[in-house]
């Protein structure tokens, strides 16, 4: 079958990362960690380490992206080149672009964008250490940062 692997995920009742099958990853959240952001968060979820910052609402640049009746949410999900064992190329790849788009779409539904015409709200997520589940962890960190902004 496609997608199957011979790698053993659980051995002697313990996962590869040392957790029991019914045990969740430990979560640590520290809010307000970035002085220059309107809202920010540092999150550790298992071995994942992620920073998130929210900036705005502010004037939208470039101006051609402005919406006369509402704000736009511009999310950017990036992984540091040193965040994984195999060196990752800096910048946005296809996966990062897709996650950035999904986060933008999700937050436009929960932020009162109609209250801020012609504005922009920027959500930056930086994965500094990745060990599976970074998309969910980054979204959680961004949600905490957004709640503080």
Regions of interest found by a model, annotated:
Residues 119-125:
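Short, conserved phosphate-binding/catalytic loop or strand-edge motifs used
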Residues 88-92, 125-133:
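A short glycine/serine-rich beta->alpha loop
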Residues 133-149:
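Glycine- and Gly-Pro-enriched alpha-helical subdomains that act as flexible
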Residues 31-33, 38-118:
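Glycine-rich, flexible beta-strand/loop modules in the N-terminal catalytic cores of phosphate-handling
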Residues 2-35, 42-44:
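Short, Gly/Pro- and small/polar-rich lid/capping loops
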């Amino acid at each position: 079958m496609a997608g199957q692997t011979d790698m053993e995920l659980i051995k002697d009742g313990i996962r590869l990362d040392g957790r029991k099958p019914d045990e969740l990853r430990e979560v640590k959240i520290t809010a307000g960690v970035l002085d220059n952001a309107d809202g920010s968060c540092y999150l550790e979820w298992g071995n994942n380490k992620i920073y998130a910052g929210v900036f705005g609402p502010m004037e939208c640049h470039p101006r051609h992206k402005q919406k006369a009746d509402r704000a736009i949410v511009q999310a950017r999900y990036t992984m540091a080149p040193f965040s994984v064992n195999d060196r990752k190329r800096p910048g946005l790849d296809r996966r990062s672009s897709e996650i950035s788009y999904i986060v933008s779409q999700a937050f436009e539904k929960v932020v009162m964008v109609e209250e801020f015409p012609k504005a922009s709200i920027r959500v930056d997520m930086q994965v500094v250490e990745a060990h599976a589940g970074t998309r969910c962890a980054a979204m959680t960190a961004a949600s905490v940062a957004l709640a503080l902004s």
